[in-house]
């Protein structure tokens, strides 16, 4: 048992406690928070390196093995998601250190708490602790969303809190039904229990599974539970919106993990997602694309791109093949980093335009227009999926993987239009921001510093994912193959206990 597995949770938790104790000094909080984020980078690479060998590491808290104790599980998929969260957190903190973090006393504590919750959700091996980590990251996100105050953020925060409280209640109901029927909430142990479940209890488990899927769909912003996202993400301050770019991926990860590890074990739950996931994914792509066309602010356009990415990812996952899941994982990394970078750039453009902000209206000439324009062009090409950047590679992989699916023509049309139509939106936006005649400059002069470094790091992600597309795609394929071979997961988590017949409720 290696302690490396728990470090992505412990380090940000310790940083959150330290920042809370230092709440009177923003400089001290910055040092602690940035130091923790920097210390996590080698941890991310170590997680990927350890998982790349194909083994599955189990961390049993307190020495209590599953299914009786709390376990963290590190496989290729968990390592990829935790590493992505860690890599995303650093530039978001860099941007916040430019001054946004000083608008509230608890920004860094809440930020680190959310990182801990995200990593815990990716690493946990049972559904109850998935719920716990969901609540940790959601509680932190409630505070982060209201950071900086403002009426729009208060309204967005209220919507966000109400929806997620409803989701949490539904999650608890599902857990109660599953525990009452199966006698366990460990994902590997649940799979073993499903194979022995009496026929009389199968309908109850399917109902609980449907509740779980509804909760995960809310987290992922799958239609019809996606209308909250553009309003909420568009209102958040830039570094918070950047970190929120991975929040929807938690729901997608949960769908992947639970369907592949748990529900795939029994015929009556194996098809729980298949009949409806592809139609809803296509509809989500369409709604996100229309939302981007209708938006009047760059930040809201980027938020709608996240909705589009959710639909694109779930369209691939609906196919449920190894190739499709591998394509989805590659595109997931791309879309998360590029969307986060675009949120930061939109805020930078808004600051440079003064009172005009990032609204699609004539404003003063941009200061640092060349640098902002270069970043805008790079991120626009990446987020639309145009060659030669990683968005094109990811979408091409997904299009290839969905061939032969029942709704393949509709999926192809939706994915291709979600690249073409947003490209027109971004071209129109560029003409407003960079080329339209304007009165004399009234925007602020932007200085190079932490925020610029953050944007450069995230803008560089797409070219790097293109250059290193082969090894990233190979890792994604290996993760997909491991996910579709859950027997190794069961053996690693349960060990000899997999063969023990435990008394269960009838």
Map each language-model feature to its residues.
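Transmembrane helix-loop-helix hairpins at membrane boundaries of multipass inner-membrane proteins
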Residues: 1-6, 14-111, 188, 478, ...
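Structural signature of hydrophobic alpha-helical transmembrane segments
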Residues: 1-11, 74-86, 127-140, 205-218, ...
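Alpha-helical multi-pass transmembrane bundles of energy-transducing inner-membrane proteins
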Residues: 27, 107-113, 117-204, 292-359
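Interfacial segments of multi-pass membrane proteins
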Residues: 144, 194, 233, 313-323, ...
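Predominantly late transmembrane helices and immediately cytosolic-facing juxtamembrane segments
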Residues: 223, 332-356, 409-444
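Cytoplasmic/organellar membrane-interface segments at the starts of transmembrane helices
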Residues: 236, 355-359, 364-374, 426-506
């Amino acid at each position: 048992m290696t302690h490396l597995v728990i470090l992505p949770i412990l380090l940000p938790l310790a940083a959150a406690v330290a920042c809370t104790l230092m709440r009177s000094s923003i400089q001290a909080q910055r040092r602690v928070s940035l130091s923790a984020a920097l210390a996590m980078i080698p941890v991310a690479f170590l997680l990927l390196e350890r998982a790349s060998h194909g083994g599955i590491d189990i961390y049993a808290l307190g020495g209590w093995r599953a299914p009786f104790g709390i376990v963290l599980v590190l496989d290729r998929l968990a390592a990829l998601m935790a590493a992505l969260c860690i890599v995303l957190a650093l530039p978001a903190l860099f941007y916040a250190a430019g001054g946004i973090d000083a608008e509230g006393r608890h920004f860094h504590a809440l930020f680190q708490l959310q990182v801990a919750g995200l990593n815990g959700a990716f690493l946990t091996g049972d559904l109850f602790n998935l719920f716990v980590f969901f609540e940790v990251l959601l509680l932190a996100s409630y505070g982060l969303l209201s950071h900086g105050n403002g009426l729009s953020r208060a309204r967005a925060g209220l919507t966000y809190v109400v929806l997620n409280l409803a989701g949490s209640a539904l999650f608890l109901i599902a857990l109660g039904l599953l525990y009452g029927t199966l006698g366990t909430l460990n994902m590997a142990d649940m799979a073993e229990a499903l194979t022995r479940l009496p026929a009389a209890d199968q309908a109850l488990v399917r109902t609980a599974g449907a509740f779980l899927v509804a909760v995960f769909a809310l987290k992922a912003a799958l239609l019809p539970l996606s209308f909250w996202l553009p309003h909420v993400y568009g209102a958040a301050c830039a570094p918070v919106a950047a970190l929120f770019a991975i929040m929807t991926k938690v729901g997608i990860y949960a769908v992947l993990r639970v369907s592949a590890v748990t529900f795939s074990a029994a015929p009556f739950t194996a098809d729980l997602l298949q009949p409806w996931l592809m139609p809803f994914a296509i509809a989500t792509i369409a709604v996100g694309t229309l939302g981007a066309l209708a938006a009047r602010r760059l930040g809201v356009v980027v938020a709608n791109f996240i909705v589009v990415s959710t639909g694109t990812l779930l369209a691939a996952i609906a196919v449920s093949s190894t190739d499709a899941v591998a394509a989805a994982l590659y595109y997931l990394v791309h879309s998360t980093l590029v969307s986060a970078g675009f949120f930061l750039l939109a805020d930078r453009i808004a600051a440079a335009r003064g009172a005009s902000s990032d609204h699609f209206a004539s404003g003063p000439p941009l200061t640092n227009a060349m640098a902002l324009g270069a970043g805008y062009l790079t991120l626009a090409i990446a987020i639309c999926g145009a060659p030669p950047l990683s968005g094109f590679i990811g979408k091409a992989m997904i299009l290839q993987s969905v061939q032969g699916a029942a709704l393949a023509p509709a999926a192809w049309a939706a994915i291709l239009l979600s690249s073409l139509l947003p490209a027109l939106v971004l071209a129109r936006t560029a003409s407003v921001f960079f080329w339209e005649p304007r009165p004399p400059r009234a925007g602020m002069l932007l200085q190079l510093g932490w925020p610029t470094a953050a944007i450069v790091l995230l803008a560089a992600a797409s070219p790097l994912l293109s250059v290193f597309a082969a090894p990233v795609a190979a890792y994604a394929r290996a993760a997909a193959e491991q996910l579709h071979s859950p027997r190794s997961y069961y053996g690693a988590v349960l060990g000899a206990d997999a063969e023990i017949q435990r008394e269960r409720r009838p």
